[in-house]
Amino acid sequence: TNVYNFIKDSLNDNESIRFLNTDFVNQWRNAHNIAKSDPLDAQTISTIIGTDSDVQYVNDNVFENKNGYQDLKALVHRHYQIKKIYSQEINRLIAQCDCLFPELQYVFEPKSAAFIAVLSSYPTTHDIINASRLEVFNIVYKATKHRCSMDKIDKLFELCHDTLVPDNISSYGRSIILDLVENIKTIKGQLKMIERYIRDVASLNPAYKLLLSITGCGPLTAATVIAETGDIKRFKNADCFVSYSGTSPRNKRSGTSVETLGKISKKGSRYLRHAIYMIAEFARRHNPVLKHQFERIKNGNKKRHKLANIAIANKIARYIYSIMKNKSSFVILHEHIMRLPEETRYAFFNSISLDFPKNTRKQIYQYSDINGEVHKFVYTKLEETMII
């Protein structure tokens, strides 16, 4: 996949390519009880094209590199692939530390700069015991950009002196940790480079800055939405876009009976669905309108948590469609705020600030007042939720 545009560019004048709708092919294969394999798929596609007059094709504009969509898509997919490798290496490192340096996780958060910096110089508990406190402090102090106190170093040494890890650790265990640390550093460098490329390409699209106005939508998430959506005009309405994002509910109907499962269809782009879900995770905590909707649907029932999340993701997908279609930024409307309970309104206005520097690194959002005037604000009190 993702190479059709290159094939298309290499065609002669008398040649053309048509793209089959994969859902249509899957449904046709299932209806004829044909197994799934590459040879059988080729035979199935050949049979469909030759015999079925109702065959469904995809608009070939989807695969054109117009406005850099395909370049951005390739970068986003590569970022997801490397991020997955990064998570795997981190998990392997934590597993090794559980055996050779368990005390470190009680002082520094795994994946943190301090955690990696300590392991790069002192891969085991006994390396710390034999080290200088001031030397360890200087390493951590530099890695955390001067945000570390000596108290944490003292706590680390105190825990290490009471360790249960034997002192006869083989050199292989130490070398595995050092190798994992080096791999993680390399992967982080690759991620930063790709993120820079993604921002450069995505910023050329006018929808990029508009999407950043959605509560919880960061630079990488906005770039993913643009890459996976392409030209918003190819969707007839918001329902079509929601269906493509895979956030639409999956219901079963038989006559007048409707079975509501509270699950999503998971059709379309999984990258787009993940991006929308990440936006929804932040928005349900900090956007007052969506927060109230989430709490109303959940109604204190833990079993309805996922159902409420799906509802918020569905709402976010509709916001995205409206923003990209109308080329307008997202604004929390005054009339929507005034419908909320007083406690929710108070919590919202108590967590934002209208006074912030022009060069702030925080995400800037908007809400309207009773006169329709739009005000920009930043959040000052946030839970530990990342905007990516």
Question: Where in the sequence are the language-model features?
Answer:
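Generic structural signal for well-ordered, non-transmembrane alpha-helical segments
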Residues: 80-83, 87, 182-192, 314
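Short helix-capping/linker segments at secondary-structure and domain boundaries
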Residues: 53-57, 89, 126, 188-195, ...
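Phosphate- and other anionic-substrate recognition elements at nucleic-acid/protein interfaces
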Residues: 1-158
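Amphipathic, charged-and-aliphatic alpha-helical interface segments
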Residues: 109-122, 184, 188-198, 220-232, ...
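Low-complexity, acidic/Ser/Thr- and charged residue-rich accessory regions of DNA metabolism proteins
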Residues: 256-260, 294-313, 317-388
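Helix-hairpin-helix/helix-loop-helix acidic hairpins
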Residues: 160-220, 284-291
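Phosphate-backbone recognition surface of nucleic-acid-processing proteins
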Residues: 144, 210-213, 219, 223-301, ...
